[in-house]
């Protein structure tokens, strides 16, 4: 049986959507929203990856495999939807208020 897909956005490519595995997307979204702070300074990409790994189901992300790619994909999608904000340089990310 083929995995169900979901359309995701990329803040860097407005108007374009991409197909992604729904189950992995939803697991990563739940983990990412659960760890990202609302306040500045937020997390770096490396901090986001480290924070979500313990929250990911091993059946979908064995040993945290591919977590980095999925963190970035979900972060870009949530940013395009206005739910995540990027702050300063070096880049840091937080939940929108």
Feature map (PLM): residue ranges:
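A short acidic, leucine-rich amphipathic alpha-helix
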Residues: 44-53, 78
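Short, positively charged loop/turn segments that connect secondary-structure elements
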Residues: 53-71
């Amino acid at each position: 049986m083929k995995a169900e897909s979901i359309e995701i956005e990329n803040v860097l490519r407005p108007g374009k959507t991409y197909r992604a595995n729904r189950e992995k997307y939803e697991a990563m979204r739940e983990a990412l929203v659960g760890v990202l702070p609302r306040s500045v300074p937020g997390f770096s990409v490396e901090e986001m990856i480290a924070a979500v790994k313990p929250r990911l189901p091993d059946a979908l992300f064995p040993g945290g495999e591919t977590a980095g790619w999925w963190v970035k994909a979900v972060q870009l999608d949530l940013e395009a939807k206005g739910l995540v904000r990027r702050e300063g340089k070096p880049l840091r990310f937080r939940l929108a208020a």
